[in-house]
């Protein structure tokens, strides 16, 4: 068994495959070294949002670039406070499926919307790895000032899990966001209360990671599971840790399934509350809020029918305008296979982005046409 375990050079933790072994308690020097790494050129830490797209940022390979407003767009494109005459402006916020991970700018669904309707100006404020909480906060800070006609909140079902998380490491120990922390909303007296704002950084974050059981903030992190963090006498045996870690991965997968299904209502409840707050804010700006549910490959078969996704049901029960793109994609995948829409990493392929844009435009068209007939539309 020792032969199949390794040590991660980035965080000093023992690994089985790409997964850290229990307990999920990184060494303080590993956390400090990670935090002291040079900032990236595209996605950067942000005290209000956890992380964001850097204004004017660019990845080394040039696949992703941002304008001065932090939107995914050519560096020389500026949106300003108002749309161009005769254009309807849509601002889109969400996670990597809104951002367009894995595809170039011209292959994002936002650019496809603009190609299909010349009267649209679609601003891409998606950020890789976001929860719905971060997307809402990005709307408030960066999207509202663009004064759109429509604001689209993209939600991928995994965001239900992210919305219960504070430090990404505990949700995704093997993930690509290291030890970054993020804001978290909780429901208190039928209102949303914001936690971890500004977000944990520096030594306070180090202390939370190395002694998580004594961190008051992490009591609100669904994924900082005490049994995963506790030190046990048997853990000096790496083989025992490896077996325990594999079993724990299956338990965590079951927790996710319960959240998607609403059997554990915590994730859907806070996600719906965030979407309601988003809709209220958008309406106060004089714009139309729309929630767009972006399909998750692993759930397509289970929730293939119209209004079968529990999150969609809960959002509609609160009278929110919802466009669920899961059913049309489920039909397409059933007919043509996953490769018709999805890349190897389960993000949308260029073709998947085009399909999504077409379905989305069909459902948006009545609202868009009505807005065109209004003064200023």
Predicted regions: what they are:
Residues 157-315, 320, 325-338:
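Serine-dependent acyl-ester chemistry module
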Residues 1, 321, 342-377:
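Histidine-centered active-site loop/cap adjacent to the catalytic His
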Residues 72, 89-91, 97-188, 193-194, ...:
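Conserved SGNH/GDSL esterase-like catalytic core that processes O-acyl groups on lipids
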Residues 132, 136, 268, 272, ...:
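Short, amphipathic alpha-helical "lid/cap" segments that border enzyme active or binding sites
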Residues 76-77, 135-143, 273-276, 307-308:
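Alpha-helical scaffolding within the catalytic cores
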Residues 96-100, 124-125, 264-268, 342-346:
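Second-shell loop/turn segments in exported
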Residues 95, 135, 151, 282, ...:
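Generic structural signal for small/hydrophobic residues in well-ordered secondary structure
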Residues 5-117, 139, 223-256, 309, ...:
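Membrane/wall-proximal cationic-aromatic binding patches
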